[in-house]
């Protein structure tokens, strides 16, 4: 039952993370001595094959203490989906479902990804989860917002990350911020991304990311040509936690 619930939560999280699919390991002892590194870049690798991998380990809080983990991996080769790869995170096999590989995985301090296809290892990398989920502090579900007006989103600080990202979704109207520095605790969504009134419901969410830095926005481009914290293909591998989605009603 727990695994089924966790998988449902994972699939729900995919709806609110259009850009993220979404790691470099950090030395926390150095970070404590010198202060947080708010700039930099994930380790970049030149691809050695024709695959593209978008991989993330997602931390989900089920209320039992600590974070449980899910894996979400999308694989393509020359633009075509790959649905018969062997995807492993540590000792867990991540099964293909829907349009990608999604399943719960055992909780660990470090998540080692290995992907094989047609008898060859095509991708390797490792990821770590942020320490907790961000919490949106200035908005509650049911709040009313004005059409075409800017919206300020504030959230709690999360440790063990390299960047944040803020999203707003309504049907196909999607806003995704650039990658924000780890010392950011607020972001303003421009009013142009709230063009529909009459009580339209917009879902607001904050992603806490371990792996990609504010200088790594190219990781989400369709014409990506390198691998971010993943060796073999182009693409990226990150650890991720997400705030609870806040539903804001937009009126004229």
Task: Describe the predicted segments one by one.
Residues 195-220:
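Beta-strand-rich modules
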Residues 2, 17-57:
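Bacterial Sec-dependent N-terminal signal peptides
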Residues 140-193:
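Short helix-loop boundary/capping segments
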Residues 120-130, 214-225:
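Edge beta-strands of extracellular beta-sandwich domains
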Residues 9-19:
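Bacterial N-terminal signal peptides
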Residues 1-10:
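Bacterial N-terminal signal peptides that target proteins for export
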Residues 133-141:
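Proline-enriched interdomain boundary motifs that mark the N-terminal boundary
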Residues 69-70, 75-91, 162-164:
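Short, ordered, surface-exposed loop/turn motifs in non-cytosolic proteins
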